[in-house]
């Protein structure tokens, strides 16, 4: 099975078992993984939203079945390149979206997202493969 990276929104939908049918179909047969950024964002949500033991347990259980792409020097270098090129184009990108894109591009993995517009520049200018569509 080939790997596909879930952005934080898709990870959230997957965690709650609420993936849109078209995305669920597109992900069938793939092994899902997330980036270190999504781990951080999910932890932030857990704290800010006051998740109780049940919801925290669901997250821990879900995480056992989803791999995590870690930070490394190649990802850091790619992030710097992506940020610089986007700035030169006059379209600076959010830092966390750039980290997620960098992880995907370094490992040549597609990104599942419901927010195509957030990653469209990375697809157009950097060759990031996107799976998904707009949020339902």
Per-segment meaning from a language model:
Residues 16-19, 28, 47-50, 83-84, ...:
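A generic structural signal for secondary-structure junctions
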Residues 9-10, 37-40, 74, 117:
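Alpha-helix/helix-capping structural signal
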Residues 1-35, 44-61, 136:
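Short, well-structured N-terminal submotif of metal-dependent ribonuclease cores
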Residues 7-8, 42, 79, 104, ...:
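Generic structural signal for small/hydrophobic residues in well-ordered secondary structure
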Residues 67-114:
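Active-site neighborhoods of divalent-metal-dependent phosphate/nucleic-acid chemistry enzymes
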Residues 11-12, 40-43, 69, 120:
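Nucleotide phosphate-binding site architecture
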Residues 1-3, 101, 105-136:
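Acidic, PIN/NYN-like endoribonuclease modules and their adjacent C-terminal/linker elements
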Residues 62, 95, 119-121:
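Short secondary-structure capping/turn micro-motifs that flank functional sites
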């Amino acid at each position: 099975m080939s790997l596909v990276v879930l952005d934080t929104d898709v990870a959230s939908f997957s965690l709650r078992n609420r993936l849109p049918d078209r995305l669920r179909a597109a992900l069938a047969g793939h092994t899902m993984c997330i980036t270190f950024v999504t781990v951080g964002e999910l932890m932030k949500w857990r704290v800010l939203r006051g998740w109780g033991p049940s919801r925290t347990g669901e997250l821990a259980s879900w995480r056992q079945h989803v791999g995590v792409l870690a930070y490394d020097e190649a990802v850091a270098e790619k992030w710097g390149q992506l940020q610089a090129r986007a700035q030169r184009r006059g379209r600076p990108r959010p830092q966390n979206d750039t980290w997620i894109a960098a992880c995907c591009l370094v490992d040549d993995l597609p990104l599942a997202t419901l927010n195509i517009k957030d990653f469209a520049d990375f697809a157009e200018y950097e060759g990031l493969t996107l799976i998904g569509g707009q949020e339902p």
